[in-house]
Swiss-Prot record:
Subunit structure: Homodimer. Heterotetramer of two MnmE and two MnmG subunits.
Protein name: tRNA modification GTPase MnmE
Record's GO cellular component terms: cytoplasm; cytosol
GO MF annotations, alphabetized: GTP binding; GTPase activity; metal ion binding
Ligase among keywords: no
Binding-site list for GTP: 226-231, 245-251, 270-273
Listed GO biological process terms: tRNA methylation; tRNA wobble uridine modification
This protein's UniProt keywords: Cytoplasm, GTP-binding, Hydrolase, Magnesium, Metal-binding, Nucleotide-binding, Potassium, tRNA processing
């Protein structure tokens, strides 16, 4: 990083009152600031108890000052942490004192961004920091920690090293174009390529599982008014999150709820009945429901077996994207018989279910996990993001194209290897546009 990088400061603990509050500061040559804050010269990696003082030498608070000298710190710069009492007024006074001493307020994720720019973390590890903070289940927290500790990155670095080795081997043959030798065959380049493709496939499979655990499954409940959508949402959530009445149109807005099934987040939207209405408020809710449908991975199509596919249900089905996966739910199974063959909704799975008694809920949850593609937590799994999956798919495609190259298309073969390396490098940040970095780190919390 540049020598002109400003000193940054932020409250690193959550807003509100607590026993301890932490101010984090990062920059170059911070010993003078430490001395101004507490009147002492702290030793690196040692907790110093002191009063934290204002410009007049009056105590603002008392607590611990920790000093981490560059480069042996989280950001790779000098870092100070002030551990004081966790009241918002005290934290605000301490932060303002740091700003008076020349620091500026840190942007979201700026401490982690500096760690990345100073080679303390790669981009996948930096994202692991945010994912650990945002983890919604124990499984997600365990896998995020693996990413933070570099498990995912080591897999990617291994792929990149193998790609570089194969590229060097292939590109060296370009120095001898006049030789009538099949260098790809002689160097077993194709055998090495096959091994690389298998390795990428393996990492991609793990990344897809990690992305499922991080991002989950988007599910919409659709069906005619009063077919039991809100009752099913309440049953899945285990709480009364949606109003249930016998009046059609009770759900006037899309009701959203997140549940966990075996640690996998499932985002469920109870749609306002997809129908035409003159009610302005209900019409807004219906538009939101249509947006939720467009973003869904799976639609739970609720059907009353007594009525089958009535005109209203057919109109709703016609409004669904044809590629959207569907699970047909025969609601209120405690009141009437289940139609085993289904009603032609386009669903591969039909489940009879009673939101009142809970019969069929476990079968539905198992089906949702199957539709999500979740295979269960396994050794070596790590948390991943959609961008990681897309990058690995791009590398997979480039290696597939390389495999199609003829024996004398060495330059094209080498170019596909290079593009596969670039795709893998995007995951760890070796090849990453500045605007992407801005988006990634802007989603962190301030102080991290």
């Amino acid at each position: 990083m540049s020598d002109n990088v400003p000193t940054i400061a932020a409250v690193a603990t959550a807003p509100g009152r607590g026993g301890v509050g932490v101010i984090r500061i990062s920059g170059k040559n911070l010993l003078p600031m430490a001395q101004a804050l507490c009147g002492k010269t702290p030793k690196p990696r040692t907790a110093t108890y002191a009063d934290f003082t204002d410009t007049d030498g009056q105590a603002i608070d008392s607590g611990l000052l920790l000093f981490f000298a560059a480069p042996a710190s989280f950001t790779g710069e000098d870092v100070i942490e002030l551990q004081g009492h966790g009241g918002p007024v005290v934290m605000d006074m301490l932060l303002n004192r740091c700003l008076e001493l020349g620091a500026r307020l840190a942007e979201p994720g700026e401490f982690t961004k500096r760690a990345f720019l100073n080679d303390k973390l790669d981009l996948a590890q930096a994202e692991g920091v945010a994912d650990l903070i945002d983890a919604s289940s124990r499984s997600a927290a365990r896998l995020a920690l693996r990413s933070l500790k570099g498990d995912f990155s080591r897999r990617i670095h291994g792929l990149v090293e193998d790609l570089i080795t194969l590229r060097m081997l292939v590109e060296a043959t370009l120095d001898f174009p006049e030789e009538d030798i099949d260098f790809l065959e002689a160097a077993d380049a194709r055998g090495k390529l096959d091994g690389l493709r298998r390795a990428v496939d393996d990492v991609l499979a793990n990344a897809q599982q990690g992305a499922i655990l991080r991002e989950g499954l988007n599910v919409v409940l659709v069906g005619a008014p009063n077919v039991g959508k809100s009752s099913l949402l309440n049953a899945l959530a285990g709480d009364e999150v949606a109003i249930v009445t016998d009046i059609a149109g009770t759900t006037r807005d899309a009701v959203r709820e997140r549940i966990l099934i075996d640690g996998v987040p499932v985002h469920i939207v109870d749609t306002a009945g997809l129908r035409e209405t003159d009610d302005v408020v209900e019409r807004i809710g219906i538009e939101r429901s249509r947006k939720a449908v467009s973003e869904a991975d799976v639609a739970l199509v609720l059907v009353d077996p007594r009525e089958g596919l009535n005109e209203k249900t057919r109109a709703i089905l016609d409004a669904l994207p044809p590629e959207l996966k569907r699970i047909e739910i025969h609601s209120k199974s405690d009141l009437h018989a289940h139609a085993a063959g289904g009603f032609g909704t386009g669903a591969e799975t039909v489940i009879a279910l009673s939101a009142k008694t809970g019969d069929g809920l476990d079968a539905l949850k198992r089906t949702l996990l199957r539709e999500a593609g979740w295979q269960g937590e396994s050794e070596g799994l790590f948390l991943a993001r959609t961008r990681h999956v897309n990058a690995l798919k791009a590398a997979q495609e480039e290696l597939s194209l390389a495999a199609l190259c003829g024996n004398h298309q060495i330059e094209l073969f080498a170019e596909h290897l290079r593009l596969a390396q670039v795709a893998c490098g995007e995951i760890t940040g070796e090849f990453t546009a500045d605007d992407l970095l801005g988006v990634i780190f802007s989603r962190f919390c301030i102080g991290k």
